[in-house]
C-alpha cells in the first residue's frame, strides 16, 4: 500500500494510462484522473479534475455550470470499482454499478474544483456482490457521500 502524508503533493500511484488498463470507461465517461492510494479489496483514494470543457457543462447550466450529481456518483463508483475489480481470487468478468444507498449532496461542484474521492470496501458477498462506502470532497469539504453497490456480470 502506498499512502501520502497530508503535506505531500498529490502524486500518482496509478496514472491515467494505468487507470485505463483497469477500468473499462473511456471519454467522456472516464472520471478518474489519478489514483493516490490503492489497496485492492480494501480502499482507494483518487482525484477527478473538473474542467470547464467537459461536455456536460454545455447544458448544465448555461451561465452557471454545475457538475451533475449523477456524474459525481459515477466518479465515486469508478473509484469503488478499482477496489472490487482488482481483488485477487475473484471470477473474471465485468463489475457494474448496481445500486446506491443514502447518497447525499452537500455542496455544488464547479469547473476548477478537484474532487478527492475516498472509497472503502464494506462487504463482498459470494465473490459477486460488493458494497463500498464513498465520499467526495473539494478543498477538504464534503460534497457527496453514500454507499454504492456492485454486481459481477459474467
Swiss-Prot record:
E.C. code: 4.2.1.59
Chief localization: cytoplasm
Compartment(s) where it occurs, according to its Swiss-Prot or TrEMBL record: Cytoplasm
One example GO MF annotation: (3R)-hydroxyacyl-[acyl-carrier-protein] dehydratase activity
TM region(s), chain numbering: none
Active-site residues, Swiss-Prot/TrEMBL: 60
Biological function: Involved in unsaturated fatty acids biosynthesis. Catalyzes the dehydration of short chain beta-hydroxyacyl-ACPs and long chain saturated and unsaturated beta-hydroxyacyl-ACPs.
Stored NCBIfam families: fabZ (TIGR01750), PRK00006.1 (NF000582)
Protein name: 3-hydroxyacyl-[acyl-carrier-protein] dehydratase FabZ
Organism whose genome encodes this protein: Synechococcus sp. (strain CC9311)
Gene: fabZ
